[in-house]
């Protein structure tokens, strides 16, 4: 989901001593599954002798709660989810950066198997055009905009085209907001501040670790 934003960090940073383990898309849709999969990856990294494990995730519907390592430092962004993470373009100054009614898109999300137009195609194939569109409309009832987050880390042209088609097919308005990958850059480069959770061995990630205090 955030592959473009992670790769952009390495364009300006020598991360030759960092091994990236990409994960399958879609785990964030099932927090319990996400918790299990990433915890197993933490155990695997421990066994491989990692001295630090950097987790490029947010709280993700409490999917991160309980992650732990007995022998290795864990570090991860102090954000509820990847959307908030990419909407924060400087130091974190509040917990929630989302705007009501917005369905957010980036390069990664437009390519995801659960992307809007893929979902629509699946609904149309399964239920037919009339019922499929009605079900999508009900599912998106609280949304008014499809919003592209321009993180500067991907070719925005195809994503704008995708967003235009989403807006047309789903009767939404389309707009663009500026974002970035600063929290991920802090995580990867080791420039850890209050925006990064750093957990010593034997500690467990808690929901309250993601609270914001000014």
Labelled PLM ranges:
Residues 1-14:
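N-terminal basic/disordered segments at the start of proteins
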Residues 16-33, 176-178:
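A short beta-strand-loop structural module common to alpha/beta enzyme folds
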Residues 31-45:
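Glycine-rich, highly charged phosphate/nucleotide-binding loops
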Residues 46-60, 106-120, 199-214:
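Extended, charge-rich low-complexity interaction segments
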Residues 49-85:
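Hydrophobic/aromatic-rich structural module bridging two neighboring secondary-structure elements via a short loop
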Residues 70-117:
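Long, charge-dense
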Residues 100-169:
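Active-site rim beta-loop-alpha module in soluble metabolic enzymes
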Residues 165, 171-214:
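C-terminal accessory domains and tails appended to enzymatic cores
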């Amino acid at each position: 989901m955030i592959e473009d934003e992670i790769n952009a960090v390495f364009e300006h940073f020598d991360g030759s001593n960092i091994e990236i383990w990409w994960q399958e898309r879609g785990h964030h849709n099932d927090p319990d599954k996400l918790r299990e999969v990433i915890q197993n990856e933490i155990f695997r990294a421990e066994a491989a002798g990692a001295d630090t494990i950097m987790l490029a995730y947010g709280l993700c519907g409490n999917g991160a709660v309980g992650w732990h390592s007995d022998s290795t430092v864990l570090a991860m962004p102090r954000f509820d989810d990847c959307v908030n993470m990419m909407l924060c373009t400087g130091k974190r100054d509040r917990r929630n950066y989302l705007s009501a009614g917005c369905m957010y898109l980036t390069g990664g999300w437009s390519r995801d198997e659960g992307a809007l137009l893929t979902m629509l195609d699946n609904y149309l194939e399964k239920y037919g055009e009339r019922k499929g569109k009605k079900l999508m409309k009900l599912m998106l009832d609280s949304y008014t905009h499809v919003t592209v987050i321009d993180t500067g880390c991907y070719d925005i042209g195809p994503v704008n085209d995708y967003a235009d088609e989403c807006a047309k097919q789903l009767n939404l308005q389309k707009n663009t907001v500026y974002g970035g990958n600063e929290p991920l850059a802090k995580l990867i480069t080791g420039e850890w501040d209050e925006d990064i959770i750093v957990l010593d061995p034997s500690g467990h990630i808690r929901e309250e670790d993601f609270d914001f205090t000014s």
